[in-house]
Amino acid sequence: QKKKYEKMVYEYSRSASSAISEFAPNNSFYVDGRKLTIDQVDLTTAQAARWRLCPNCSHAQIEEMGKNTSACPQCGSSAWADAGQVRTMLKVQMVYSNMDYTKSLINDESDDRNNVFYCKQLLVDVDEDHDISSAYRMDNEEFPFGYEFVRKATLREINFGESDMTGEKLSVSGVEEVRKGFRICKYCGKIQPQNGKANHSFACKTRKIPALMQAD
């Protein structure tokens, strides 16, 4: 008789500022004497959308079909229109770590906390035409300093994937970096390796219809 598996569910939470790295795909976090690695995104709560990101300023907006994209509405950059400035992004609410309980346990010999590093960026988007109430600068050419008072600003912190030195670069808000993103199955939310065998949940429809993987 085969031994039956017992499924145990534990829930942990982090602030958004911590979770964007600690609960990011392929990263591991340590709790209750265990090392848990994130391997799946909950797609029932995540919001997917295509965003256009300005290479020159911090402006970003959801891509809309038929909308004029010839120049950034904030800074006027013509590079805003480049197709490469559009990325599909997920607003993640919940992730999973599916692991064997015994394998997740750590001891003194295995407690090497090697965390994954990510390419992250905080975008501070301000409508300069309507939300800057006043601005000041030093009247001294040798000491260039100024500041602005703004009524409101939109802050977006984006995780663009694991840090890497090689690959195609993308400029966002004046910063050019390799931004590989994450490969996630759109049917089951399992994190896919950059190279190697695909990884899917037992209930993923790609297991019954493998052609779905080729279609993507």
Regions found by a protein language model. Name each.
Residues Q1-D216:
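Extended Lys/Arg-rich polyanion-binding regions
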